[in-house]
């Protein structure tokens, strides 16, 4: 086991042969974090060498002896510092020694709160100024960046992963499933309240299944949501992190998949639901409309005015929640990153 804060080779399959001129991708953070995992996956898809580092404090030592070649960072500010300003300073320090390109994740938006948005926007502006190339994962994120005065060089959508069909699938009788790290942005409390309303109305078999683990600092929030459903007579389950080999089965078992987002700029979990052949119930938003345009028929969009009623109808007939899985998009992801780096004037191809 690799000690926290140390660099380590990518787990699992070996990295592909490096693509000529590709920057070193730094996958910063715990391996189970979604952004860290995506950094590794996108690097492998693009044929980019990967350096995995658990903590930002370990970056200087991990890069020692590697020269001053270009690097690519996948950034969400909590991975790079205890505060947004600390995160920006860490990227600026790195960019002082070598060319840096970045993919900005979790782009700030007002829905997360005005003061938090202000602090994070200032940090993302500093990061973008330090970077020679800025990538985001949706047109919605591009618009958010434009509103903040951040120029985006490329939009590379999050791909549908390759899950494959489950070996054994036993669909639940009456369950509502929420997938991924559990926190207020996933509106777990709202889903729990809708499940509680159905249970209180006589649905004795309904189960709230939370297919993931609480995000750091949100155990009490998840516990409160579970208690809401349980107090009304509903059944509850928290699986903890779902192993990759079990994803297709676990996501395929739930009766009604739900992916409500209070504030989202791009979401990998929607692609994972699709890869499992599921069409989740989602709140309408700019990003959701963008995803429905890109993958027509992949989402069940609701205005949220009667979530309990939406769930009741789908529990009675869950067939609209099942779709043929779209083809995986990992190869296209790799091509898109290579194309973006090729246009980087101070990056690969432009370095002495």
Language model features with spans:
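Glycosyltransferase donor-sugar binding loop
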Residues: 207-223
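Conserved donor-binding/catalytic core segment of Leloir-type glycosyltransferases
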Residues: 168-186, 192-195, 208-209
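Short hydrophobic beta-strand element within catalytic cores of glycosyltransferases
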Residues: 279-284
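Nucleotide-activated donor-binding/catalytic signature segment of Leloir-type glycosyltransferases, i.e.
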Residues: 222-242, 248
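A charged, aromatic-enriched C-terminal amphipathic alpha-helix characteristic of glycosyltransferases
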Residues: 37, 305, 309, 315-352
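Membrane-proximal helix-turn-helix segments that form the acceptor-binding/catalytic region
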Residues: 89-93, 98, 116-133
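Donor nucleotide-sugar binding/catalytic pocket of nucleotide-sugar-dependent glycosyltransferases
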Residues: 129-165
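Acidic donor-binding loop of glycosyltransferase active sites
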Residues: 249-265, 278
């Amino acid at each position: 086991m690799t000690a926290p804060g140390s660099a380590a080779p990518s787990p699992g399959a070996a990295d592909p042969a490096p693509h000529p001129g590709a920057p070193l991708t730094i996958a910063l953070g715990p391996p189970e974090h979604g952004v860290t995992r995506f950094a590794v996956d996108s690097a492998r898809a693009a044929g980019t060498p990967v350096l995995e580092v658990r903590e930002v404090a370990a970056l200087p030592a991990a890069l020692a002896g590697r020269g001053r070649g270009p690097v690519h960072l996948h950034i969400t500010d909590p991975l790079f510092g205890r505060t947004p300003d600390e995160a920006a300073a860490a990227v600026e320090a790195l960019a002082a020694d070598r060319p840096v390109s970045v993919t900005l994740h979790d782009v700030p938006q007002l829905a997360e709160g005005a003061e938090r948005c202000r602090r994070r926007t200032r940090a993302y502006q500093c990061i973008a100024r330090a970077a020679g190339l800025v990538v985001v994962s949706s047109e919605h994120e591009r618009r958010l960046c434009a509103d903040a005065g951040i120029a985006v060089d490329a939009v590379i959508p999050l791909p549908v992963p390759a899950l494959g069909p489950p070996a054994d699938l036993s669909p639940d009788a009456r369950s509502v499933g929420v997938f991924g790290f559990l926190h207020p942005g996933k509106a777990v409390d709202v889903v729990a309240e809708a499940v509680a309303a159905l249970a209180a109305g006589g649905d004795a078999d309904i189960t709230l299944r939370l297919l993931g683990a609480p995000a750091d600092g949100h155990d009490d929030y998840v516990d409160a949501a579970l208690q809401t459903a349980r107090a009304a007579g509903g059944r509850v389950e928290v699986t903890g992190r779902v192993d990759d080999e079990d994803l297709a089965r676990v996501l395929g078992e739930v009766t009604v998949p739900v992916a409500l987002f209070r504030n989202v700029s791009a979401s990998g979990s929607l692609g994972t639901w699709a890869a499992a052949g599921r069409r989740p119930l989602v709140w309408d938003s700019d990003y959701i409309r963008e995803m429905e345009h890109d993958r027509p028929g992949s989402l069940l969009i609701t205005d949220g005015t009667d979530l309990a009623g939406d769930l009741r109808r789908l529990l009675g007939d869950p067939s609209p929640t099942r779709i043929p899985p779209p083809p995986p998009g990992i190869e296209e992801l790799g091509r898109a990153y290579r194309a973006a780096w090729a246009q980087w004037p101070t990056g690969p191809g432009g370095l002495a």
